[in-house]
Amino acid sequence: MTESKFHAKYDKIQAEFKTNGTEYAKMTTKSSSGSKTSTSASKSSKSTGSSNASKSSTNAHGSNSSTSSTSSSSSKSGKGNSGTSTTETITTPLLIDYKKFTPYKDAYQMSNNNFNLSINYGSGLLGYWAGILAIAIFANMIKKMFPSLTNNLSGSISNLFRKHLFLPATFRKKKAQEFSIGVYGFFDGLIPTRLETIIVVIFVVLTGLFSALHIHHVKDNPQYATKNAELGHLIADRTGILGTFLIPLLILFGGRNNFLQWLTGWDFATFIMYHRWISRVDVLLIIVHAITFSVSDKATGKYKNRMKRDFMIWGTVSTICGGFILFQAMLFFRRKCYEVFFLIHIVLVVFFVVGGYYHLESQGYGDFMWAAIAVWAFDRVVRLGRIFFFGARKATVSIKGDDTLKIEVPKPKYWKSVAGGHAFIHFLKPTLFLQSHPFTFTTTESNDKIVLYAKIKNGITSNIAKYLSPLPGNTATIRVLVEGPYGEPSSAGRNCKNVVFVAGGNGIPGIYSECVDLAKKSKNQSIKLIWIIRHWKSLSWFTEELEYLKKTNVQSTIYVTQPQDCSGLECFEHDVSFEKKSDEKDSVESSQYSLISNIKQGLSHVEFIEGRPDISTQVEQEVKQADGAIGFVTCGHPAMVDELRFAVTQNLNVSKHRVEYHEQLQTWA
């Protein structure tokens, strides 16, 4: 009989004999021959009347002797049957010491209930995320199937929720920008949107509650010598099971080929943000699990022997790796050298998962790790498949405008660039082939190649730039592997009659490709492109794309925030001709201004404005002028992106039409 059935039967018998003023229980004993002798409280006590019960209750010794004699008879019967197992039901109730029995009953109930509740609460955490995903999937389907319905959500109530819940940063403006806590940026971090923060906070609170609910000390618990040993064991079981439930989920959210991206409409950056928070909570649960189990085992004297067992050694390996992941994944390290972080991260995750499997398999929870491994393996197989079918191609890689890499890769006929999308590039160089970097596509007139751009920063882009710098034209042919395409255009083009694309610096390629793609498909929409750059030289690496805008109905404006800085304009000289005047006192300065003038003439379809734009005023004007729903799509410097988000939230009620905001900035590092 299982413990749960035992307790259920016990409670039933107790209820039957409450009227007699005594407390009985069903007990199982073994005869000397090894056969089971079952004794039970007789239901016939009700028919025999209260006199029998009162005799039993008033003479405890009599009850015991009666039981003893019956047991002896049963034992003899067993011998008489040549050792065959016989069972005899004793109808005389047994009087037990209920005060001594209660701690055993309560202790085993607490232990069993803790396991059951841990599984229920772990399922509850998964159910919470399933609910969030279900809502996101439903909302995404409605947007795609009924775009006009979305446009009708522009009333005061809808705008109230969007202004204070759905669109804004958690604290005033900063979302793409990191929050600096000082100490040389070591504790800097990113805080998501207000809605995302609420989702994360609820998850953290639920996890904290589920880790402690229905755990309490059982007085005189016979299982543990001390209260610390008892509570430590209960908390360790609870947090360990909760942490195990979350592992497949955090692996799923961290994959590039997460099918949920297409169902929910969330971008990779959103899933990565949730991946990080679930991982942080999960590792903290595992650390609490390890600490509380150690406290319990030391209190009971089992620590040294238990730590010699294989499953505990592997559990220790997994916990240590989880702790290093938690520390090493801080924004400070990701920003300093993302490629190094990523390689170390993968190695630590492998040991975390393998160690977790060998720790959990003997405890009956190994299937959770198999689920995590299956999710991870699926992502890797798809990624390798994308790379294999694209093939190793010779790419032309060059430095443009001193701070930008341009990569041109011949592509297979089946491969189509996604407007606003990106691909991961593996450079087949001895020190670089294990690393990959996301590059954003841009639209070109040629259909036989992919053109991608990336700002030169630390890590792989810096290494490529150093390799190209001494070469003629800062250009070389490098064999590459391409993994992609990833991403998709925003829904602004589907939902809005007016679309304003705002790019800052190197955020232009994806914004440009989405803008041009929309212009090719639409004839009745108002499409504007605003590009904010610091220097004139930034135009040099994007001249061809800007010239192509002549063929579209896109209204283009370029802001040059530091127009007085004319350095680096020599890169234009092979494209734009001008006549030098040797009789001028300052021929260099004259040449620069002449060149700028010629650039403007060559791009006469583009409006050039010198100075920094007032984004708030710009947004207000665009919203007031819109004759229908208007959407702002942006990518660029985090400060600019945050400023635009804030301006949109402040102007939702300026027009009777719907105002949307779409952020294409992918913050992975």
UniProtKB/Swiss-Prot annotation:
Top EC group: oxidoreductase
Reaction equation(s) it catalyzes: 2 a Fe(II)-siderophore + NAD(+) + H(+) = 2 a Fe(III)-siderophore + NADH
UniProt region (Disordered), positions on chain: 17-86
Listed EC numbers: 1.16.1.7
Gene Ontology MF terms: ferric-chelate reductase (NADH) activity
Cofactor(s) this protein requires: FAD
InterPro entries the record matches: FAD-bd_8, FAD-bd_FR_type, Fe3_Rdtase_TM_dom, Fe_red_NAD-bd_6, Ferric/Cupric_Reductase, FNR_nucleotide-bd
Locations listed in the record: Membrane
Coiled-coil ranges per UniProt: none
Glycan attachment points: 20, 52, 64, 116, 152, 524, 653
Source taxon at top rank: Eukaryota
One GO BP annotation of this record: intracellular iron ion homeostasis
PROSITE patterns with a match to the protein in the record: FAD_FR
Segments traversing the membrane: 122-142, 198-218, 234-254, 281-301, 313-333, 340-360, 499-519
Residues the entry annotates as binding FAD: 437-442
CDD domains linked to this entry: NOX_Duox_like_FAD_NADP
Keyword field: Electron transport, FAD, Flavoprotein, Glycoprotein, Ion transport, Iron, Iron transport, Membrane, NAD, Oxidoreductase, Transmembrane, Transmembrane helix, Transport
Family assignment from sequence similarity: Belongs to the ferric reductase (FRE) family.
UniProt name for this protein: Probable ferric reductase transmembrane component
